[in-house]
C-alpha cells in the first residue's frame, strides 16, 4: 500500500510541475489554483505537495536542473570523441530547455539543491570543453570559462531565434545542435 501511495504522490508532483511550467510560461503571475486546475488536481492537493508558491518554484528549479544533468549523462559524453559528445549533449540539453523554457530562462530560487545541480552541470560542461580542447577542436589557449559562457548563451539564443515559430523544422534539437556547435567552433567566419 505504501508503495502505491508513493507512486501516486510522485505522479501528482510530476503533474503539478509540468502544469506549473506550462501555466507560468503563459502567465508568470499565475496562482496556485490555476496551476492545480491545469494539473487536474485540487488546490488542496497542490498545497499538500508544495506549502507555497516559493516552494513550488524551488521544486521547478531543482527538477529542471536535474533533467539537464540527466540529459548530459544520457548523452554518455565520455563514450565518444569530443565532437560527437558535444553534439549529443547539446541536442539533449536543447530538448530539456525547450520543455522547461520558463523555469530555465527565469531567475528561479537558488536552493542548495539547485546550486549543487548547477555546479554539476558546469563541471560536465567544463570537462567536455577540456576534452574538446585536448582533441584540437578548441584553440590550446582558449579561455574555457569564457567558452562555457558563450556555449550557454548559444544554447539560449538557439531556442529564441527570430522567426523560428514560423518554421518548426528550425526548432528541431538536432538542427539547433548543429547550429550551436558550428557557431561555437567556427564563429561566423568562412569555413574553409
Regions found by a protein language model. Give the residues of each.
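Short secondary-structure transition hinges
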Residues: 55, 95-127, 137
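C-terminal peripheral helix-coil segments that are non-catalytic and often amphipathic
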Residues: 88, 123, 127-135, 153, ...
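Amphipathic, non-transmembrane alpha-helical scaffold segments
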Residues: 9, 61, 65, 114-122
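Solvent-exposed, amphipathic alpha-helical segments
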Residues: 19-26, 67-78, 96, 150-161
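Basic, helix-initiating cap at the start of DNA-binding domains
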Residues: 1-38, 55-58, 63
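All-alpha amphipathic helical-bundle segments outside canonical DNA-binding/catalytic cores
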Residues: 84, 116-117, 134-151, 171-176
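Hydrophobic alpha-helical connector segments
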Residues: 59, 70-98, 109-114
